[in-house]
């Protein structure tokens, strides 16, 4: 049976101590034979609303901490890059390079990521027609010498895409579940359940969010039939230094993931 992809971890590396505490609580997912698990955290949040917002420890220290998670817990790592020159050093640690939603059309960034040995996760921009993500996927595939298109070509060559909501007026996002079906024509699809409930800039210099909708939307995405899920999670989201309002508390993640596995099994049995 095909494994469900699960990407989870704190939004940003706040400290090595916090990262290890979260990784300790996520290790059961890494050991689950039905899950392909990736630990996620960012070394630099370069697109924060305010210049005064916490960004993370930076490239050098951040990669050391992510490598220590890999060494201690045997987890694969996903982290995002914002500049082309970050691709090579980050790929020495990360198994997946993530392209931020705001940068999903940036050719140089996509090409730099695709030139590495890492997989590439392209987050669909909040502004983007879901069918247009195919052009970003093609940039990555053609960089890897692949002229074929479609789901199978992307899957075989380590390229997948993520839905994280679409702009719905000012300071709000909405999830169009049709996007999951459309994007899956071009690549494996991950549903970013936590950023999809974000309210950009709604907290006055930072983003707000409605975390009570994370689990219902994740269940809906599972019922559509996709490849995996992305959750930013924290021991205490209220104290998180980034994206706390839309994070899922670690205490809720286990039951949520178990439910998603059950839904996916039902979908597979009825196809």
Swiss-Prot record:
Principal subcellular localisation of the protein: cytoplasm
Pathway in which this enzyme or protein is active: Carbohydrate biosynthesis; 3-deoxy-D-manno-octulosonate biosynthesis; 3-deoxy-D-manno-octulosonate from D-ribulose 5-phosphate: step 2/3; Bacterial outer membrane biogenesis; lipopolysaccharide biosynthesis
Enzyme Commission number(s) of this protein: 2.5.1.55
Keywords in alphabetical order: Cytoplasm, Lipopolysaccharide biosynthesis, Transferase
Pfam families documented for this protein: DAHP_synth_1 (PF00793)
GO molecular function, one term: 3-deoxy-8-phosphooctulonate synthase activity
GO CC, one annotated term: cytoplasm
Catalytic reaction equation(s): D-arabinose 5-phosphate + phosphoenolpyruvate + H2O = 3-deoxy-alpha-D-manno-2-octulosonate-8-phosphate + phosphate
InterPro entries linked: Aldolase_TIM (IPR013785), DAHP1/KDSA (IPR006218), KDO8P_synthase (IPR006269)
UniProt subcellular location: Cytoplasm
Keyword Cytoplasm: yes
KW Metal-binding (keyword) present: no
Any one biological process term the GO annotation gives: keto-3-deoxy-D-manno-octulosonic acid biosynthetic process
Record family assignment: Belongs to the KdsA family.
Protein name, UniProt field: 2-dehydro-3-deoxyphosphooctonate aldolase
Organism: Campylobacter jejuni subsp. jejuni serotype O:23/36 (strain 81-176)
């Amino acid at each position: 049976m095909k494994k469900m992809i699960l990407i989870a971890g704190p939004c940003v590396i706040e400290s090595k101590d916090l990262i290890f505490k979260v990784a300790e609580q996520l290790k059961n997912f890494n050991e689950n034979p039905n899950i392909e698990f990736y630990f996620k955290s960012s070394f630099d949040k370069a697109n924060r609303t305010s210049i005064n917002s916490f960004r993370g420890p930076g490239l050098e220290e951040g990669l050391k901490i992510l490598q220590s998670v890999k060494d201690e817990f045997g987890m694969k790592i996903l982290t995002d890059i914002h500049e082309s020159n970050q691709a090579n050093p980050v790929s020495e640690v990360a198994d997946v390079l993530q392209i931020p939603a705001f940068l999903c059309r940036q050719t140089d960034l996509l090409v730099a990521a695709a030139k590495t040995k890492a997989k590439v996760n392209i987050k669909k921009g909040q502004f983007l027609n879901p069918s247009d993500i195919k052009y970003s996927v093609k940039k990555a595939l053609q960089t890897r010498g692949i002229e074929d298109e479609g789901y199978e070509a992307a899957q075989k060559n380590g390229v997948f895409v993520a839905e994280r909501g679409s702009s719905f007026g000012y300071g709000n996002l909405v999830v169009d579940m049709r996007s999951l079906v459309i994007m899956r024509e071009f690549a494996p699809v991950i549903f970013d359940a936590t950023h999809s409930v974000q309210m950009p800039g709604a907290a006055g210099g930072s983003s707000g969010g409605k975390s009570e909708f994370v689990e219902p939307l994740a269940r809906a995405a599972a019922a559509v039939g996709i490849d995996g899920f992305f959750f930013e999670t924290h021991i205490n989201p209220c104290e998180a230094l980034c994206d706390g309002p839309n994070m899922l508390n670690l205490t809720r993640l286990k039951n949520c993931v178990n439910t998603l596995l059950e839904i996916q099994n039902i979908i597979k049995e009825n196809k």
